[in-house]
Regions:
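Terminal low-complexity segments of carbohydrate-biosynthetic enzymes
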Residues: 266-388
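Acidic donor-binding loop at a coil-to-helix junction in glycosyltransferase catalytic cores
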Residues: 219-225, 239
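Conserved donor NDP-sugar-binding/catalytic core segment of glycosyltransferases
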Residues: 130-167
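Acidic donor-binding segment of Leloir-type glycosyltransferases
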Residues: 33-89
Length: 388
């Protein structure tokens, strides 16, 4: 599939990957945004510093032809396209993005840049002019992956679905602020956001190899990849400076994604119903528990190294655990991310009935009250306190 591509430029730092199925109409704008990449001073990026890989999978239109014609008109852009007909069982974005990321990683390793990274976007998305340089700046701080902001392209502010989307964004940004208060991480400080999706996601080639590549699932493959990174204790930054603009189409190419979410909001608007979302009281308890568990993990790891016997904390019952079960999980886990994934599953079973989902407007009000209260208190008092 990729055998006809020229070798990567020596020292290429970024490989941009774009899965495309019947995207002949949208791709020119997507590619134009990549061809116009600049540094923070407005100077064009060096042509050899990045390349773009497009995989036209199971297309019925002229997607591949459009890419080739664009490449001819923009010879400075290192743009490559491959075509593939995937079997029905594999004809989904997860498989397409995996094939792209695997090839991007291979080429970056061949190029030899020590900080090489894979940058994922979509065929209906326009990246900001400083997208790549902003990703590189975040990765230079030592993080392993970057999730950027995904904004609606030319959205009508009077559209009912648009209003629902803005309220949803407000909810998740308030969540991110609450999480930062309760369990702050030095590599993902505030200001940050909540998104880490395929339209705007980057990770180092080294991190990609470390987790064994992109999980092959029909949809939400981006979420599965981030979960794998977290499970391996790799550092994911949610950067507000890394931005893209995506289409607001309701007929998308995947079973579950932004277009599916927009359709769900439209249906709720038509029936005058509100979305139900996670209860902020449960979120508060969850993140305080995680902060406590993180502290216990660090102490346990140090004690295991020194051979000391560490007394266990008194809070495991809040997660539906006995002390014996907690000690067992601490012994089995090879990373904090793996430990938290197991404990969180038990916590959700233990607390779902206690804190059921609530309407979006109620959740926003609760979060605003929680965040306002925490904003007025010293951070040392907030972090790590367990809510029961």
């Amino acid at each position: 599939m990729w055998h006809s591509l020229p070798p990567p430029a020596r020292g290429v730092q970024a490989s941009v990957i774009i899965p495309a199925k019947d995207e002949a109409t949208n791709l020119p704008a997507t590619l134009a945004a990549l061809a116009a990449q600049t540094d923070l001073h407005g100077q064009a990026l060096l042509p050899h510093s990045f390349e773009v890989l497009v995989l036209a999978n199971n297309c019925l239109d002229q997607t591949a032809r459009v890419v080739r014609e664009f490449a001819t008109r923009h010879p400075r852009l290192r743009l490559h396209v491959a075509e593939i007909k995937l079997p029905k069982a594999q004809a989904h974005v997860g498989q397409a993005r995996r094939l792209l990321m695997d090839e991007a990683c291979r080429r970056l390793e061949q190029g030899g840049h020590p900080r090489a990274f894979i940058a994922s976007t979509d065929a209906d998305t326009r990246v900001s002019p400083t997208w790549l340089i902003s990703i590189a700046a975040e990765l230079a701080t030592g993080v392993d992956a970057v999730g950027g902001r995904i904004l609606m392209d030319n959205a009508d502010p009077t559209c009912p679905v648009r209003r629902c989307q803005l309220r949803d964004a407000a909810y998740y940004l308030l969540r991110a602020r609450l999480e930062d208060h309760l369990d702050p991480t030095p590599y993902d400080p505030w200001p940050r956001h909540h998104q880490h999706f395929g339209a705007n996601l980057a990770l180092t080639a080294r991190a990609y190899r470390h987790v064994g590549g992109l999980p092959v699932v029909p949809y939400l493959e981006d979420e599965a990849l981030v979960q794998s990174l977290v499970r391996h204790d790799l550092r994911v930054r949610h950067s507000p400076t890394v931005k893209v603009f995506t289409s607001g189409r309701q007929q998308g190419r995947v079973a579950v994604g932004l277009s599916w979410q927009l359709r769900q909001w439209a249906e709720l608007q038509q029936t005058q119903r509100e979305p139900l979302v996670d209860n902020p009281q449960r979120l508060l308890a969850e993140w305080q528990l995680r902060a406590q568990l993180r502290q216990t993990w660090q102490q346990y790891s140090s004690a295991a190294t020194s051979g000391a016997l560490l007394p266990l904390p008194s809070w495991p019952a809040a997660a539906g655990l006995s002390r014996a079960a907690l000690r067992r999980e601490l012994t089995r886990a090879s990373s904090f991310g793996q430990l938290w994934e197991k404990i969180r599953g038990r916590f959700l079973v233990h607390t779902t009935r206690r804190w059921p989902a609530v309407p979006l407007s109620v959740a926003i009000r609760m979060l605003r009250e929680q965040v306002a209260a925490l904003d007025s208190r010293p951070s040392a008092v907030v972090a790590g306190q367990l809510c029961t």
